[in-house]
Design a protein with these regions (language model features):
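A membrane-topology feature that recognizes alpha-helical transmembrane segments
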Residues: 1-306
Length: 306
């Protein structure tokens, strides 16, 4: 159990995180609107009225104002509250994970970039080059601190090559890239942070996260279009794969069952892919969600659980 001093430091790390989160909101919104992050002073995005000092207190202002502008009474985006709270929580988690160290400081910066890039990607599907460059730079600095620079450089190249390969696969189905160029830069940045070997697990976890988010939306779309054959093929593939995994966990299982199970998984998977690709005739038919947030979620999970 943490001692009193550790909890005291954690409290102030959380407060600092809230304040940084408030600043990150400014970076996000003014970056998208191409305004200076310094001038003009904070204002309501609806009525443009300059805010009073107590309107800028992280979390508290949103609660006290009940999520509305003090002047025009229009609703304030919950993004302000969510980003501030998330930053505070992540900063505190990083403190408990790394302690007071150079690695902690670098991770605070890296996670700040994660948050900014996630929100801009979700809001406008935009990844600014400067943020990608900073991610690579601080990833390399972190690798220097951990005496692992060569591994980091290989990770950058690996991340870029893998994402470009995946992006090219999109041309086979929807005549366009499967992922944006920004996602390639993100993968390069994650390669700088993790190195080449852990990056493979992070990218695999990213695909799982993306699938978990996208699958319900895709199934809903198929249901509305009455594409029941595709829904059934997806369900069969998932059921067969789950049963195969359960059976192969038994060490006494015969090789015949393993071979038959493997064939069933492959056949059901190919049939599932065939049905899905038949329903995706163009990029507009596909459910396209930004992949950057999935990579950042996967990276965060890997960092905190590793």
């Amino acid at each position: 159990m943490p001692d009193i001093l550790t909890l005291y430091i954690a409290f102030w790390i959380f407060i600092i995180g809230l304040c940084i989160g408030s600043f990150l909101n400014v970076v996000i919104l003014r970056g998208l609107s191409k305004e200076s992050i310094v001038f003009p002073p904070s204002k309501c995005p609806k009525c443009q009225h300059a805010l009073i000092w107590w309107h800028n207190i992280p979390l508290l202002s949103y609660i006290l104002l009940r999520g509305k502008c003090y002047f025009c009474h229009e609703k304030i985006s919950p993004q302000y509250f969510i980003v501030e709270l998330l930053t505070g929580i992540l900063f505190t988690g990083i403190f408990f994970k790394f302690g007071i160290s150079i690695s902690m400081l670098l991770m605070l910066i890296i996670f700040s970039l994660f948050i900014v890039m996630t929100v801009t990607d979700l809001k406008e599907k935009v990844i600014f080059d400067i943020h990608s460059i900073l991610l690579v730079i601080f990833g390399l600095v972190l690798s220097l601190v951990n005496h692992n620079l060569q591994n980091s450089i290989i990770g950058i190249l690996e991340g870029v090559l893998i994402m470009e390969l995946f992006a090219s696969i999109g041309y086979l189905f929807v005549k366009s890239r499967a992922f944006g160029v920004g996602d390639t830069f993100i993968a390069g940045g994650l390669g700088a942070i993790f190195g080449w070997y852990p990056l493979l697990f992070v990218l695999l976890l990213s695909l799982i996260v993306q699938a978990v988010i996208t699958l319900p939306l895709y199934l809903k779309k198929l249901y509305k279009a009455k594409e029941f054959k595709t829904i059934i093929s997806l369900a069969l593939f998932l059921i067969i794969t789950a049963c195969y995994k359960l059976f192969t966990m038994n060490k006494d299982i015969s090789m015949l069952i393993i071979y038959v199970g493997t064939i069933l998984v492959v056949v059901s998977g190919l049939y599932c892919v065939r049905q899905v690709t038949r329903n995706i005739k163009s990029a507009t038919d596909a459910i396209i969600l930004p992949f950057g947030p999935a990579m950042f979620i996967a990276a965060s999970i890997f960092i905190f659980l590793n």
